[in-house]
C-alpha cells in the first residue's frame, strides 16, 4: 500500500509539469486570466509556467525542493484568491468554484510535498 501512496508524489510532479507546459504553450490564450491589477499581463503566464516546471525539476533532482514546493503552494494559493475567488464573487461561470477548490487542494498537496517528501531542507527549516 505504501508503494501506491508513494506514487502521489509523482502524480503531483506530473500535474505541475502539464500545467507548466500548458502555460508556456498557450500563454496568449491564458493571458485573459491575469487579474487587471497585475501589471505585465502575459508575462505572468510565462513566469508561472516556468516556475511550475522548475519546481518539478527541483523535486526530481532533490535540490531546493522544500523551498520550491513551499513557494509553489503560495503561488497556487495566489491563483485561487486572485483569479478564482474573484471570479466566484463576480458571479461568473459556476465552474469557477471547482477551479477554486482544485487550487486550494493543490496548495495543500504542494505543502504536503514540502513537508514530507522534500530532501533538501537548506532554505526552509
What label would you give each PLM region?
Residues 7, 26-38:
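Short juxtamembrane and helix-loop transition motifs at transmembrane-helix boundaries
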Residues 1-25, 44-54, 60-125:
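Extended, low-polarity transmembrane helix blocks
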Residues 41:
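Short, aromatic/His-centered strand-loop micro-motif at the edge of beta-sheets
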Amino acid at each position: 500500500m505504501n508503494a501506491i501512496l508513494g506514487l502521489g508524489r509523482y502524480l503531483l510532479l506530473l500535474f505541475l509539469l502539464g500545467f507548466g507546459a500548458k502555460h508556456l504553450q498557450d500563454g496568449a490564450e491564458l493571458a485573459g486570466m491575469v487579474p487587471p491589477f497585475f501589471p505585465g499581463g502575459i508575462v505572468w503566464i510565462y513566469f508561472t509556467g516556468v516556475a511550475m516546471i522548475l519546481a518539478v525539476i527541483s523535486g526530481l533532482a532533490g535540490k531546493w525542493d522544500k523551498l520550491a514546493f513551499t513557494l509553489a503552494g503560495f503561488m497556487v494559493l495566489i491563483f485561487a484568491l486572485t483569479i478564482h475567488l474573484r471570479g466566484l464573487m463576480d458571479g461568473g461561470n459556476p465552474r469557477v468554484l471547482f477551479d477554486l477548490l482544485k487550487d486550494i487542494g493543490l496548495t495543500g498537496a504542494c505543502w504536503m510535498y514540502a513537508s514530507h517528501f522534500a530532501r533538501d531542507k537548506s532554505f526552509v527549516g
